[in-house]
Amino acid sequence: MFKIYAVSDSIGETAEQVANATAYQFGSSVKVERVPYVKTFEDVNNLISIIKNPNEAMIISTIVLVDIREFLVQRCVESGIHISNVLGPCISLVSTILNKTPEYKPGAVWDMDKKYYKKIEAMEFAIRYDDSKDHSGIKHADIVLIGLSRTSKTPLSIYLANKGIKALNIPLMPEVPVPEELFEIDRKKIIGLTIDPMHLIEIRRHRVDNMMKIPTELKYANAERVLDELEFADKIMRKLKCKVIDVTKRAIEDTALIIMESVFSDRII
């Protein structure tokens, strides 16, 4: 059986994907074997020694390290082994077009994968601790959003999760005790969300109408109730000494940008 060796100086996922896509075109007559972390001349020699018959194998390489890549090509030529270097020509072409020297960093795709999984983890975190009654996540959150109902806490948590940021949100209500954990974490992580009372009343009444709960004077959308809640939330935010953002008619993206600039002012997201 013909074998394709997917060789890389990182985990080899890109090389294996290319090899699998190639092998797929030839059914069961081609087998793929991943050979990761080829970073030394010795690693190259060990690989070459495995291939006994050059007519029954080839190498697909995504090695970025120049000296190792060139040595592998040299050894393949000496041994009569066919090799396809996937990244080399692409890197060279882009380098020529941009007139810029590449950094030759192995594992770029793996770094992208890590970012992807970080987003997934942040998304799961946001969903788990949405309007959280479970306060155990407060100490593990990158950002804690606090505010009244209908102040965009949930959509902000989801938006931030898409940036790989673990955001937890806690609703503030006069009848519900404020979690003690809020007073035990870095205040910089806490973001208070406030809103114009008339705008909040309008949003809540619209919500009530959609839920077909009449009359709109229902406590949830009652003007006096809303003012009481806003006063309560303001007291809590002042007590926490946290940053407060007015979300009145502000887009989620704009609010999120302010939050990220505030919390991560010392680093780039």
Swiss-Prot record:
Reactions catalysed, semicolon-separated, are: N(tele)-phospho-L-histidyl/L-threonyl-[pyruvate, phosphate dikinase] + ADP = N(tele)-phospho-L-histidyl/O-phospho-L-threonyl-[pyruvate, phosphate dikinase] + AMP + H(+); N(tele)-phospho-L-histidyl/O-phospho-L-threonyl-[pyruvate, phosphate dikinase] + phosphate + H(+) = N(tele)-phospho-L-histidyl/L-threonyl-[pyruvate, phosphate dikinase] + diphosphate
Q: Which Pfam families match?
A: Kinase-PPPase (PF03618)
The answer to keyword DNA-binding applying to this record is no
Q: Which GO terms describe its molecular function?
A: ADP binding; ATP binding; phosphotransferase activity, phosphate group as acceptor; protein serine/threonine kinase activity
Q: Which InterPro entries match?
A: Kinase-pyrophosphorylase (IPR005177), PPDK_reg (IPR026565)
Q: Which residues does the record give as ADP binding sites?
A: 147-154
Record keywords: Kinase, Nucleotide-binding, Serine/threonine-protein kinase, Transferase
Q: What is its EC number?
A: 2.7.11.32, 2.7.4.27
**Membrane spanning stretches:** none
- What family is reported? Belongs to the pyruvate, phosphate/water dikinase regulatory protein family. PDRP subfamily.
User: Tell me, what does this protein do in biology?
Assistant: Bifunctional serine/threonine kinase and phosphorylase involved in the regulation of the pyruvate, phosphate dikinase (PPDK) by catalyzing its phosphorylation/dephosphorylation.
What is the name of this protein? Putative pyruvate, phosphate dikinase regulatory protein
